[in-house]
């Protein structure tokens, strides 16, 4: 019977541990060497980095197909990374991880609401922080202040289902295959580089907004930002950028 089989297996395991006491220690050590297990900091950080890169590439290809033009979709002044997509991947995973076994309809509805709220907040933040608008859905039906629209909210819902049911499980397995020490070093270094890039991009965009208001730069930092990130550079890097009215 099944019960007798389980008892028999436990007896064998106890005898093996007694005969070879290092078995359990080696098993625990092997488990400890697993990088970014579960849904902790390093898993979310890895998903942020991967999501930022893949999101930028996908959006670039999408724009090329729909507009016939190759334009930059990066959030940063250096590198091809979309911070909006990176944060979305990490945030979506963190919130929906506990519901990953729920039905597709549940994930879709949750993702639709969550994605719409996230995009709206991002739009408000960029307008307040930089005085700029990166997207405007005013010409699309069922929009809310041009910041979000119903169709794109549904896209967020579909993306949530695909992400939680297919993409996330695959990426999670690949991430966990990295050696623990090497994985933490690589992930930490990439986070430091991206953080520095984000800080520089934030400063460059803020200074761009000041220039549009006719404000003179004061200090060495403002002078360097004007020199290395002039209007021509910013407007080419962020082609959809508009000054908020």
Predicted regions and their residues:
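Short, small-residue-biased leader/transition segments that mark boundaries at the very start
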Residues: 2-8
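Cytosolic juxtamembrane amphipathic/interface segments immediately preceding
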Residues: 26-40
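Interfacial segments of alpha-helical transmembrane regions
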Residues: 43-49, 101-117, 182-189
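Functional transmembrane or membrane-interface alpha-helices that line membrane-embedded catalytic
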Residues: 45, 67-105, 112, 126-165, ...
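Transmembrane alpha-helix/helix-exit interface in multi-pass inner-membrane proteins
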Residues: 56, 60-63, 116-129
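Cytosolic-side transmembrane helix boundary signature
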Residues: 158-187
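Internal/C-terminal transmembrane anchor helices
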Residues: 180-204
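Membrane-interface segments at or immediately adjacent to transmembrane helices
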Residues: 206-245
């Amino acid at each position: 019977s099944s019960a007798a089989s389980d008892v028999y297996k436990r007896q064998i395991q106890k005898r093996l541990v007694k005969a070879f006491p290092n078995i359990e220690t080696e098993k625990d050590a092997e488990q400890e060497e697993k990088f970014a297990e579960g849904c902790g900091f390093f898993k979310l950080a890895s998903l942020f980095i991967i999501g930022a890169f893949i999101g930028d590439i996908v959006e670039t290809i999408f724009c090329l197909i729909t507009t016939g033009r190759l334009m930059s979709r990066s959030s940063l002044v250096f590198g091809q990374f979309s911070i909006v997509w990176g944060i979305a991947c990490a945030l979506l995973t963190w919130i929906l991880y506990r519901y990953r076994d729920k039905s597709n309809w549940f994930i879709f509805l949750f993702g639709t609401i969550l994605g719409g709220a996230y995009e709206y907040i991002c739009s408000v933040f960029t307008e307040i922080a930089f005085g700029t608008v990166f997207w405007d859905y005013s010409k699309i039906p069922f929009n809310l202040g041009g910041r979000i629209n119903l169709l794109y909210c549904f896209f967020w819902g579909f993306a949530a289902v695909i992400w939680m049911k297919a993409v996330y499980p695959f990426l999670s397995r690949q991430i966990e295959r990295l050696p623990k020490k090497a994985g933490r070093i690589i992930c930490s270094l990439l986070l430091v580089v991206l953080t520095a890039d984000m800080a520089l991009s934030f400063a460059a965009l803020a200074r761009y907004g000041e220039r549009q208001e006719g404000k003179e730069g004061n200090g060495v930092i403002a002078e360097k930002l004007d020199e290395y990130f002039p209007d021509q550079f910013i407007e080419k890097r962020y082609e959809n950028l508009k000054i908020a009215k």
